Swiss-Prot record:
Record GO biological process: glycine decarboxylation via glycine cleavage system
Uppermost EC category: transferase
Name of the protein described by the UniProt record: Aminomethyltransferase
Disulfide bond annotation, renumbered to this chain: none
Native source organism of the sequence: Ralstonia pickettii (strain 12J)
Catalytic activity: N(6)-[(R)-S(8)-aminomethyldihydrolipoyl]-L-lysyl-[protein] + (6S)-5,6,7,8-tetrahydrofolate = N(6)-[(R)-dihydrolipoyl]-L-lysyl-[protein] + (6R)-5,10-methylene-5,6,7,8-tetrahydrofolate + NH4(+)
Amino acid sequence: MTLQHTPLNAIHRSLGARMVDFGGWDMPVNYGSQIEEHHAVRQDAGVFDVSHMCVVDLTGARVRDFLRGLLANNVDKLQTPGKALYSCMLNPKGGVIDDLIVYFFREDWFRLVVNAGTAPTDLEWIVAQNAAAGTDVTITPRRSDNNAGAEPLGILAVQGPNARAKTYAALPGSQAVGDALKPFNAGFVTVENVGEIMVARTGYTGEDGFELVVPAAQIAGVWERLLQAGVRPAGLGARDTLRLEAGMNLYGQDMDEHVSPLDAGLAWTVDLQSERDFTGKAALQAGGQREQFVGLILRDKGGVLRAHQKVITAAGDGEITSGTFSPSLSLSIALARLPKEVPVGTDVQVEIRDRKLTATVVKLPFVRNGKALVS
């Protein structure tokens, strides 16, 4: 299979990036030291090319009606232009088709940002649900590989305690817009020789920063400006250790179409209180929460927590969904699905290479805004 390329592919290669197949996309895993990239984001500022993710514009008079039924979270929370909401999109059995961010700009214009590997099936599902609902929404994907004739867009995630200041230095005129943004809000700024950029105060690292949605034809210039302002390129390897420390799910690993958001630590993104119906609601109400989603810290030496390892508890077995060595904590950490009866603070056993090693159950996240929340 031929891998898809983001508009920055040649630049990544010129920087010496190690490239990997990520969901059918040729993506940089690191540019040298993954741990140094991780620390740069926790302590200063790093930039990730996330143009493999897909922006989808939804337009029409009944977009809000359509999204009320499509998403598990309630888009009626979005009343101020630029406000964003994290949500899952569910199948009728309550499984997660994808997790995404929805932005509200006008009553006739909402914008989704969906995951890279799921984008084709997401679009098929959204088109089918629109047809079934008769809402007559126009669905326009904006990714470079599938943009329906619309101007293709790329995404740069600038993350870290100094990310905002360095973005302002790189993009003259952006500070007035950026300073006005609260977390999970977005605005637009016009930058000379670039055009209009969407600036969103969102991210996937547990640090402050922006996600910049940039015309694909101009994204190389924006990337170069960020590097000149002292932002360090960072790859998918650091992105994974950062999001894991932040207790953030990775689609396809921590949840998928067979997992309920209630069992993936995402109950806070599901609105079961309002009378609004949505796809998957009845299944969630009937099934309820079966398991809990927690953090683990390995206490014994001699192993690293990894996905699919069995977790043995007095209340029954569970499983690690994601695991790594945490550069910020110098500990092995994991996300895991365990029986609901296991309290935080409990020591459990993890099967690692025919050995049983002790780990402690902790509340997520492990790290937020550069600070360790566990020990």
